[in-house]
Swiss-Prot record:
<dbReference type="GO" id="GO:0046872">
    <property type="term" value="F:metal ion binding"/>
</dbReference>
<comment type="function">
    <text>Catalyzes the conversion of 1-hydroxy-2-methyl-2-(E)-butenyl 4-diphosphate (HMBPP) into a mixture of isopentenyl diphosphate (IPP) and dimethylallyl diphosphate (DMAPP). Acts in the terminal step of the DOXP/MEP pathway for isoprenoid precursor biosynthesis.</text>
</comment>
<feature type="binding site">
    <location>
        <position position="12"/>
    </location>
    <ligand>
        <name>[4Fe-4S] cluster</name>
    </ligand>
</feature>
<dbReference type="InterPro" id="IPR003451">
    <property type="entry name" value="LytB/IspH"/>
</dbReference>
<feature type="binding site">
    <location>
        <position position="230"/>
    </location>
    <ligand>
        <name>(2E)-4-hydroxy-3-methylbut-2-enyl diphosphate</name>
    </ligand>
</feature>
<keyword id="KW-0560">Oxidoreductase</keyword>
<feature type="binding site">
    <location>
        <position position="131"/>
    </location>
    <ligand>
        <name>dimethylallyl diphosphate</name>
    </ligand>
</feature>
<feature type="binding site">
    <location>
        <position position="200"/>
    </location>
    <ligand>
        <name>[4Fe-4S] cluster</name>
    </ligand>
</feature>
<feature type="binding site">
    <location>
        <position position="81"/>
    </location>
    <ligand>
        <name>(2E)-4-hydroxy-3-methylbut-2-enyl diphosphate</name>
    </ligand>
</feature>
<keyword id="KW-0408">Iron</keyword>
<dbReference type="GO" id="GO:0050992">
    <property type="term" value="P:dimethylallyl diphosphate biosynthetic process"/>
</dbReference>
<feature type="binding site">
    <location>
        <position position="131"/>
    </location>
    <ligand>
        <name>(2E)-4-hydroxy-3-methylbut-2-enyl diphosphate</name>
    </ligand>
</feature>
<protein>
    <recommendedName>
        <fullName>4-hydroxy-3-methylbut-2-enyl diphosphate reductase</fullName>
        <ecNumber>1.17.7.4</ecNumber>
    </recommendedName>
</protein>
<keyword id="KW-0414">Isoprene biosynthesis</keyword>
<feature type="binding site">
    <location>
        <position position="172"/>
    </location>
    <ligand>
        <name>(2E)-4-hydroxy-3-methylbut-2-enyl diphosphate</name>
    </ligand>
</feature>
<dbReference type="GO" id="GO:0051539">
    <property type="term" value="F:4 iron, 4 sulfur cluster binding"/>
</dbReference>
<feature type="binding site">
    <location>
        <position position="230"/>
    </location>
    <ligand>
        <name>isopentenyl diphosphate</name>
    </ligand>
</feature>
Length: 317
């Protein structure tokens, strides 16, 4: 089978930095134990399991504050998705050692919200309900940040926004086409709105790569966790922009061979939080796949989870 490897794909710098910081915490004997990660360090269950295997506990809850309240001692790692000021304050009050792995691009949005709300703005924030990145952003100024994901929610915004200064910004991993459409609708309702599109560069170039490169293939496989918003958006872009059917899989074991019937050329990409070795297993399998040769249908290649984490240099005493 012909395989088209969409480029760029896979890890972004924010994910790599977050994983390195968490791995360095594990390797640092001076940090108080136990080590907890407040939510998934990045949205990939294989990465989470790799850290669990090293004795690092991933703690989750309905929100970050609820999860934090279950931690009484040790070290807490804040994930790449960013954290609200109140959660940070509470971690300090509990006497926890903090390792902050927040993505710099996310922190830029936090700074923007902090600056604009201090100047008297309300903020319309385009993001996904229930995702930790909007939770952290809203927490910067909870009385002045309004989360929307869908167009109908624009009509439900407070009436005071017609008379106030308004900023619209967004979660960094949204579909750039969805964000643009929502911004256009917001501008029609609030002509005085100030726009700051914060789709991060890594998200943008990966979406554009799919839009431009997947169109001449019969199928796109996106390798990414179901909780990874940027991975799910890549499949959406393939269907809606490139016109190519797409499926998202967490790893090779989730690939349904029925999808490959009648397909001669398949494209492969991966989300920003997907480990490269996991994507490589999918590409290698598809490259040797022959529908008429059962010996090429084995989808259970061994992968050492420890190998998906970035290496850290030994710490000197």
């Amino acid at each position: 089978m012909k395989v088209k490897k969409i480029s760029p794909r896979g890890y972004c710098y924010g994910v790599v930095d977050a994983m390195k910081l968490a791995n360095e915490a594990v390797a640092n004997p001076d940090l108080p134990r136990p080590i907890h990660i407040l939510g998934m360090i990045v949205h990939n269950r294989h990465v989470t399991q790799a850290f669990e295997d090293l004795g690092v506990k991933t703690v989750d809850g309905e929100d970050r504050m609820q999860a934090l309240e279950t931690i009484d001692r040790g070290t807490v790692v804040f994930t790449a998705h960013g954290i609200s000021p109140l959660v940070r304050k509470r971690a300090i009050e509990k006497g926890l050692t903090i390792v902050d792995a927040s993505c710099p691009d996310v922190l830029v949005t936090h700074d923007l919200i902090r600056e604009k709300t201090a100047e008297g703005y309300d903020v319309i924030y385009i993001g996904k309900h229930g995702h930790p990145e909007p939770e952290g952003a809203i927490g910067v100024a909870p009385d002045h940040v309004h989360l929307i994901q869908y167009e109908h929610e624009i009509d439900q915004l407070p009436s005071r926004l017609f008379e106030r200064k308004i900023l619209v910004t967004n979660q960094t991993t949204m579909s750039q086409w969805d964000v643009s459409a929502l911004i256009e609708t917001i501008q029609a309702r609030y002509p005085h709105v100030e726009v700051h599109n914060e789709i991060c560069n890594a998200t943008q170039v990966r979406q554009e790569a799919v839009a431009e490169q997947a169109g001449d293939c019969e199928l796109l496989i996106v390798v990414g966790d179901p909780k990874s918003n940027n991975s799910n958006r890549l499949a959406q872009v393939s269907k809606e922009i490139a016109g190519t059917n797409a499926y998202r899989i967490g790893d090779l074991s989730e690939l349904d061979l029925n999808w490959l019937e009648g397909v001669e050329t398949v494209a492969v990409t991966s989300g920003a939080s997907t480990p490269t070795p996991i994507t490589k297993k999918v590409i290698d399998f598809l490259s040797q796949y022959d529908p008429d040769d059962l010996s090429t249908h084995d989808k259970t290649p061994f992968l050492e989870l420890r190998s998906i984490l970035p290496k850290v240099k030994a710490l000197r005493k």
